[in-house]
Amino acid sequence: MSFPKELERVLEITKAQNVWRRTQTLNLIASENVMSPLAESVYMSDFMSRYAEGKPYKRYYQGTKYTDEIETLAMDLMNEITNSKDCDLRPTSGTIANAAVFRVLAEPGDKALIAPVQAGAHVSHTKFGTLGALGIQHIEMPFDEENINVDVDKAIKMIEEVKPKFVVLGGSLYLFPHPTKELAPHVHAVGAKLVYDAAHVYGLIEGKVWSSPLKEGADIMTVSTHKTFPGPQGGAIFSDGSEVFKQVSRTIFPWFVSNHHLHRLPATAVTAIEMKYFGESYANQITRNSKALAEALAERGFKVIGENLGYTKSHQVAVDVRQFGGGNKIAKLLEDANIIVNKNLLPYDKPENVSDPSGLRIGVQEMTRYGMKESEMEEIAELFKKVIIDKKDINEVKKEVIDMRKNFLEVKYTFDDMKDLEKYSSKSLKLII
């Protein structure tokens, strides 16, 4: 029997996606990454067909003995690389992790302080997302546009006046660390909790190029496991022994998650092991690359945000492209050349301009994992110039992009072969392999 046409089309689309995004494009979306072949090999397993409601060894289903083992191992590994005491991997995304934390910390009608939306706050922090769905009132903290950060003095005054149930730091446009240690004492002084959304920078935290929020006074930290931490899509919650974590952990199931997509667990564990051995070098190269790309773009005439601060300390670069037609137009133009970025609000944009903002948000973490370094950032900046400023033929630039990718198809910062696995032999690795 021949394949049904519908099935053929499904296979064609999947193959086309794999060829396009894995071999022909410069993937510069700040919220994406790529797993290693090793992590992908354990992602596709029987775990994806199974259920395991509840916590390890306290399940509501039978047949979970290996689920309990891999979940416990994965949490232990994540705590080890994070230097934390508590980890819960059941949230299926960073937004679900935020929802669980927010729901425990506040009731409908309560107040929470966040960074301004146009200055990088994630939609889940706002009335348009999770906070709004939970009936929690969000109030934006004062923002220092020059320093691209929360205004510490004004924020302290607001905390003292508003007395919120919690304060959220972290964001989705996130160039420089928010003032955790500066605000934490004042948050706690009014009886509030400090929540740090590290979805974008978790890989930089465990890679030790970004300060640990938990060590600077955050009560709880939420993360995504697929941005600068290059694992499977999912979320996690960490703490350093806080009572808040215990409360949140008790409510993840059944309030926000039933089954928690068990095939994520072995892939997360493998990625944690990779980051244990390669995470610091990976994170360091990410930050070198982002700075190199920012400088190269600025040298070619682009208005890169944060010049007075060195442009960036994260994996991200933000560029104002209003003079070329705005973020929406330019993001689409770059996609035509196989350069994948996203349009983004900049700190001086109005929230209602979200569909056509001033800026582009660029992330270097995925192409760094494919082995690109500072010299390639120069090449990428030149490709941007050819498309946006020089207005070169898009198809010609697209060919250059495809040729460039031919040399960067192999995932780095992982174990290359079984000899590497033997070299770094450990009890944890033997359990996975």
UniProtKB/Swiss-Prot annotation:
PROSITE patterns: SHMT (PS00096). The keyword Transport does not apply. The record marks 226 as: Plays an important role in substrate specificity. Pathway: Amino-acid biosynthesis; glycine biosynthesis; glycine from L-serine: step 1/1. It comes from the Archaea. GO terms for cellular component: cytoplasm. One of its GO terms (molecular function) is pyridoxal phosphate binding. Its cofactor is pyridoxal 5'-phosphate. Keywords: Amino-acid biosynthesis, Cytoplasm, One-carbon metabolism, Pyridoxal phosphate, Transferase. Catalyzes the reversible interconversion of serine and glycine with a modified folate serving as the one-carbon carrier. Also exhibits a pteridine-independent aldolase activity toward beta-hydroxyamino acids, producing glycine and aldehydes, via a retro-aldol mechanism. This is Serine hydroxymethyltransferase. The gene is glyA.
